[in-house]
């Protein structure tokens, strides 16, 4: 008969774990997490230990925060607005089509003067209906000449008193007609469409290469090393299709449309808001093209300074 050996009664006395133990990662392999802010308790402890050093640290922090705010304000001002850019006197003169010599004074809500009127560039030679001063004056002189009463060839039978009376009547009628034509052809009495056409002519006169090639010091971009300049053909007429002219025309349209949207009910005008977005994107494409082709030239700097265009108008994404 085999001997009986004592053994454990059941599995209660077993302390073995059938699951494999999860080994904790080594301390050296764990990532280091650094916190920039200390707790309030630590702040109070440091403040009690060294109040003078704590005050100096807070003073340095305040100076740094103030300087960072100033630099951010400068960067924001240099970046500008993607729609309006920086309002220059030439851009502000678009509102009156170059007929107002000073800007309207800005008044606050309490009636106090906020900003003094500034001088604006003018174009007094422009008239309504696509006329200018020379054409208007020549038409008046021609009308006066053909309507002037003719004196009798036979001076023996002529009546001097009647001729003088007819001359006075003609002068009075001519003065009345000239005053009426002046009122009709005045740009101040025109509408938005008339101001748009006048601003287009002003943009051509200001940024057209038939003008800037003669007035700017270095209109074209510098040539690459070893590239010989080629003779350019003589321009046959005014420049109406260059990039700077088209950008100036788009800027005048964008300003008129943005001012209309800022008025009463502009937030509900979805159609004009879409038109404004399309104009801004079209100007952005032209500016990127011109920056690639004309960067460093007098045309590029002259356009940016006159129209007040900032990097926000052609860099990054424009969302309205």
UniProtKB/Swiss-Prot annotation:
The keyword Mitochondrion is annotated on this UniProt entry: yes
Places the protein is found: Mitochondrion
Keyword field: Mitochondrion, Ribonucleoprotein, Ribosomal protein
Gene Ontology MF terms: structural constituent of ribosome
A biological process from GO: translation
SUPFAM superfamilies reported in the protein's UniProt record: S15/NS1 RNA-binding domain
Gene Ontology cellular component annotations, sorted alphabetically: mitochondrion; ribonucleoprotein complex; ribosome
Region annotated Disordered, chain positions: 37-60, 214-242
First-listed, main subcellular location of the protein, grouped into a coarse class: mitochondrion
Cited function: Component of the mitochondrial ribosome (mitoribosome), a dedicated translation machinery responsible for the synthesis of mitochondrial genome-encoded proteins, including at least some of the essential transmembrane subunits of the mitochondrial respiratory chain. The mitoribosomes are attached to the mitochondrial inner membrane and translation products are cotranslationally integrated into the membrane.
PANTHER family: RIBOSOMAL PROTEIN S15, BACTERIAL AND ORGANELLAR, SMALL RIBOSOMAL SUBUNIT PROTEIN US15M
Family, per entry: Belongs to the universal ribosomal protein uS15 family.
Assembly behavior: Component of the mitochondrial small ribosomal subunit (mt-SSU). Mature N.crassa 74S mitochondrial ribosomes consist of a small (37S) and a large (54S) subunit. The 37S small subunit contains a 16S ribosomal RNA (16S mt-rRNA) and 32 different proteins. The 54S large subunit contains a 23S rRNA (23S mt-rRNA) and 42 different proteins.
The protein's name in its UniProt record: Small ribosomal subunit protein uS15m
Species name: Neurospora crassa (strain ATCC 24698 / 74-OR23-1A / CBS 708.71 / DSM 1257 / FGSC 987)
Lineage summary: Eukaryota, Fungi, Dikarya, Ascomycota, Pezizomycotina
